[in-house]
């Protein structure tokens, strides 16, 4: 079985205490990374308690731990000394439990995942084994890159680079593959789409032909590659890659990968004008993620599904439906942790703004909708990434057009075209340029 802990294997009650704890850790990890969230949490919570590991039960407690971890690493640095003695089995199990929780929760509960990532790094630095430090440092450093602050992003990228050098020093292809993938994730967060695709696919190559045991690493790499291809508008590359990933995920019974791959299949269908197929992909993904084993909340998977659904509504000239979808999800989005993370934050703000602007074309409440779109554009303009500022310029131009300010609209669309080209987003640039040409008529 995919989880590696199926009921038809040797009964767990026959295992010794050390083997039992290892089996619990593996079960928690595999449940979580494959999308069996409730099953994973049911194993992880008592496991963390039994090992005296922190498991923050509220968002505020998790945020407090993040602040303390950040201060700790700022004060002590990330230096370490090679170990002078082997790691005790109980301590090794705690390290691996932290790692299992950090990666297993990363695309479900990023705030709690970050607390485990910090605990993992703290313990790995204390022990000093270079391979474990490389793994922990690369993963923890993504927290800085994800936020969007230029200063923190630079620090995060420097730490990821150091982790990659440590991994290369070990000669372990799995560790080198992981840190290569994480370098690609950092590229994506910085808007370097082509480099992101190159690096995450190089990381997959370093992992070799293995599928079991590195499923999470392969899934994260593929998810990043799919997102980068969407930003590039490279639909001919996206479709076959997403379909191949979906087939593999179905063979493994990997719910997480089935959902994410299926949604990118939906994007490829939408680009091919298969609106019904795109809608079906979104519906299938939502149903699968809402099946048994998923906790309440608004996860990465909900964000990806909402983006495809809103795109379908706009492509089908249904702005009321697009706005209703975003508005219905907005309270859950606000209470989630996704707006702390740069990539979904930019996408979600743009999604809401585009829905508002589209509806303003046909609504009697035009003034209110234009104010909403303008406010969201202002938020996007404050983001450090160029493509966010491009989206802001295009949205402001759209607002100006509906207000009858044609010269301002032309300037805005021209600026957005330049910025989208600078962001290596030719399809977005072409769409804006088409709107600019329409204004010239």
Language-model features: locations:
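Alpha-solenoid helical repeat architecture
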Residues: 15-24, 56-63, 89-94, 128-139, ...
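Hydrophobic, small-residue-rich alpha-helical packing segments that form membrane-like cores
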Residues: 148-251
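Generic long, charged, amphipathic alpha-helical segments
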Residues: 366-432
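Conserved small-residue packing positions in alpha-helical repeats and bundles
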Residues: 28, 102, 121, 141, ...
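Extended alpha-helical scaffolding segments used for macromolecular assembly and cargo binding
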Residues: 1-34, 38-47, 87-129, 133-136, ...
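Amphipathic alpha-helical segments of tetratricopeptide repeats
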Residues: 9-13, 46-56, 121-125, 161-171, ...
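Amphipathic helix-loop-helix modules that constitute alpha-helical solenoid scaffolds
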Residues: 32-118, 146-158, 194-198, 214-219, ...
């Amino acid at each position: 079985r995919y989880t590696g802990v199926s009921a038809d294997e040797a009964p767990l009650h026959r295992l010794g205490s050390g083997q039992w704890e290892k089996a619990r850790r593996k079960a928690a990890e595999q449940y979580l990374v494959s999308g069996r969230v409730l099953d994973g949490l049911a194993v992880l919570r008592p496991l963390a308690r039994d090992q005296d590991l922190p498991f923050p039960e509220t968002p505020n407690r998790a945020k407090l731990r993040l602040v303390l971890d950040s201060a700790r690493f700022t004060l002590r640095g990330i230096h370490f000394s090679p170990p002078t003695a082997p790691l005790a089995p109980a301590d090794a199990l705690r390290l691996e439990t932290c790692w299992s929780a950090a990666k297993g929760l990363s695309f479900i509960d990023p705030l709690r995942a970050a607390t485990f990532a910090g605990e993992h790094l703290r313990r790995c630095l204390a022990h000093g084994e270079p391979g474990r430090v490389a793994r922990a440092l690369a993963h923890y450093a993504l927290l800085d890159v994800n936020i969007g602050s230029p200063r923190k992003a630079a620090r995060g990228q420097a730490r990821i680079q150091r982790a990659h050098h440590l991994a290369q020093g070990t000669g372990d292809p799995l560790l080198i593959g992981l840190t290569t993938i994480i370098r690609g994730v950092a590229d994506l967060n910085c808007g370097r789409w082509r480099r992101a695709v190159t690096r995450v696919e190089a990381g997959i190559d370093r992992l070799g032909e293995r599928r079991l045991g590195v499923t999470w690493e392969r899934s994260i790499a593929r998810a990043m590659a799919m997102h980068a291809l969407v930003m590039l508008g490279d639909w001919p590359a996206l479709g076959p890659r997403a379909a191949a990933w979906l087939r593999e995920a179905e063979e493994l019974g990997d719910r997480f990968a089935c959902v994410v791959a299926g949604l990118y299949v939906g994007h490829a269908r939408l680009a091919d004008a298969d609106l019904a197929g795109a809608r079906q992909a979104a519906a299938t993904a939502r149903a699968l993620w809402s099946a048994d084993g998923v906790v309440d909340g608004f996860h990465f998977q909900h964000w990806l599904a909402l983006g495809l659904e809103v795109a379908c509504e706009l492509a089908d000239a249904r702005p009321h439906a697009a706005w209703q979808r975003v508005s219905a999800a907005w309270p859950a989005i606000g209470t989630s942790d996704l707006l702390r993370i740069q990539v979904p934050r930019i996408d979600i703000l743009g999604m809401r703004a585009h829905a508002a602007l589209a509806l303003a074309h046909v609504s009697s409440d035009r003034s209110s909708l234009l104010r909403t779109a303008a406010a969201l554009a202002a938020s996007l303009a404050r983001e450090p990434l160029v493509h966010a500022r491009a989206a802001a310029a295009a949205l402001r131009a759209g607002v100006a057009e509906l207000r009858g300010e044609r010269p301002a609209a032309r300037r805005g669309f021209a600026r957005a075209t330049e910025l989208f080209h600078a962001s290596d987003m030719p399809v977005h640039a072409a769409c804006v340029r088409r709107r600019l040409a329409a204004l010239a008529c």
